[in-house]
Amino acid sequence: SVGFKAGVKEYKLTYYTPDYETQDTDILAAFRVTPQPGVPPEEAGAAVAAESSTGTWTTVWTDGLTSLDRYKGRCYHIEPVAGEDNQYIVYVAYPLDLFEEGSVTNMFTSIVGNVFGFKALRALRLEDLRVPPAYSKTFQGPPHGIQVERDKLNKYGRPLLGCTIKPKLGLSAKNYGRAVYECLRGGLDFTKDDENVNSQPFMRWRDRFLFCAEAIYKAQAETGEIKGHYLNATAGTCEEMTKRADFAYELGVPIIMHDYLTGGFTANTSLALYCRNHGLLLHIHRAMHAVIDRQKNHGIHFRVLAKALRLSGGDHIHAGTVVGKLEGERDITLGFVVLLRDDYLEKDRSRGIYFTQFWVSLPGVLPVASGGIHVWHMPALTEIFGDDSVLQFGGGTLGHPWGNAPGAVANRVALEACVQARNEGRDLAREGNEIIRKASKWSPELSAACEVWKEIKLYFEAVDTL
């Protein structure tokens, strides 16, 4: 009979299309799916495609008013995960028309929305996303990008050095500014507000901005180098956030900061637009990422959050260290470091890269290595991250036995020694300790730092493995 046939039918009849040839304009997703016992992988994969696009649990007569074939997500390939009993990588293609232009918020609401609470799945993780140029071109991306940042700062041929001001909470604005000045004066390029420093009773944002600006200008005048402090503009409302960004702009400082996951993608994209229009660099902190990305079988992998940030906009983003106190398995970390910086990234499953990604001319983002790192890590960091990165030593600067400025000196000397050694063709991985030891002979500050941290090890097995 012709017409509407009510009732529940299997998702795979509509949404599992193994013969589908993906289009250049499709957004492609790779999900790690753990079905409930008794649910076949084809049905689970089709359910993911359906629930994250046009489907619902039963046939509805309004399906007849549109062309499902044009708008539905399609599960086009399924492969079992090696070494796991009941896990599959499910590939889904979404037609571009399902998404609003220039909105990470809308893209995520579909792809990682309700489907994650779906009962037929025991767990679901979004491992990777291919954003086609047709979609990425609808975004502004980072306010400035790597090359423009180097030109603004007049710093070339080496990683940039930063430091998070500690104790993260409790300092008055004046003492905070003093710590900023000492670090910048000692040789760092940047200092940083901690991610949870917004505007609390012990230090209101306006006071902090003023004292930090004073510190920046004083350090610049004395060193002849351009300096910056990531002024955290994150706030409870977008209007308040913009007000803080405005004040930073009026002070003439080079860079501000945002917590993009807690602040949200809508706020972040607005701030990135503001920064481009006002010539401010934007540093992005990823507080809350581990809630989303740390479980191996459920959530969203950080490489997807990193791609989303490059679309939404930011000039720096924290990306793990490989060697410090926070997560980061080497190959996987390098995978999303390349994805943040480069125009083009080949599919490479050994790095967890499921799709070839072509960013066309979207500016790049500097990866920030931060968390439990100190001078002995400098050779490894220089080798792993290369020149286009920011190396941030919080405790590794402020924990120096002689104080903040000598801590900054130690880090700058160590970095310059590593860069020089690398440029001379030496092997940082093999000769790193020797390079640091030699440099410490003519730098008492570095020598003292080497002594303090020579025994420190923060080794646990990485959770983020393939």
Swiss-Prot record:
Its cofactor is Mg(2+). It catalyses: 2 (2R)-3-phosphoglycerate + 2 H(+) = D-ribulose 1,5-bisphosphate + CO2 + H2O; D-ribulose 1,5-bisphosphate + O2 = 2-phosphoglycolate + (2R)-3-phosphoglycerate + 2 H(+). Substrate binds at residues 114, 164, 168, 286, 318, 370. GO terms for biological process: photorespiration; reductive pentose-phosphate cycle. CDD domains: RuBisCO_large_I. The active site is at 166 (proton acceptor), 285 (proton acceptor). The disulfide bond which can form in the large chain dimeric partners within the hexadecamer appears to be associated with oxidative stress and protein turnover. Keywords: Calvin cycle, Carbon dioxide fixation, Chloroplast, Disulfide bond, Lyase, Magnesium, Metal-binding, Methylation, Monooxygenase, Oxidoreductase, Photorespiration, Photosynthesis, Plastid. The modification N6-carboxylysine is found at residue 192. PROSITE patterns: RUBISCO_LARGE. GO terms for molecular function: magnesium ion binding; monooxygenase activity; ribulose-bisphosphate carboxylase activity. It comes from the Eukaryota. The record marks 325 as: Transition state stabilizer. Pfam families: RuBisCO_large, RuBisCO_large_N. It is found in: Plastid, Chloroplast. The modification N6,N6,N6-trimethyllysine is found at residue 5. It is an enzyme of class 4 (lyase). Binds 1 Mg(2+) ion per subunit. GO terms for cellular component: chloroplast. Its EC number is 4.1.1.39. InterPro entries: RuBisCO, RuBisCo_large_chain_AS, RuBisCO_lsu_C, RuBisCO_lsu_C_sf, RuBisCO_lsu_fd_N, RuBisCO_lsu_N_sf, RuBisCO_lsuI. Heterohexadecamer of 8 large chains and 8 small chains; disulfide-linked. The disulfide link is formed within the large subunit homodimers. Belongs to the RuBisCO large chain family. Type I subfamily. The basic functional RuBisCO is composed of a large chain homodimer in a 'head-to-tail' conformation. In form I RuBisCO this homodimer is arranged in a barrel-like tetramer with the small subunits forming a tetrameric 'cap' on each end of the 'barrel'. This is Ribulose bisphosphate carboxylase large chain. The lineage of its organism: Eukaryota, Viridiplantae, Streptophyta, Embryophyta, Tracheophyta.
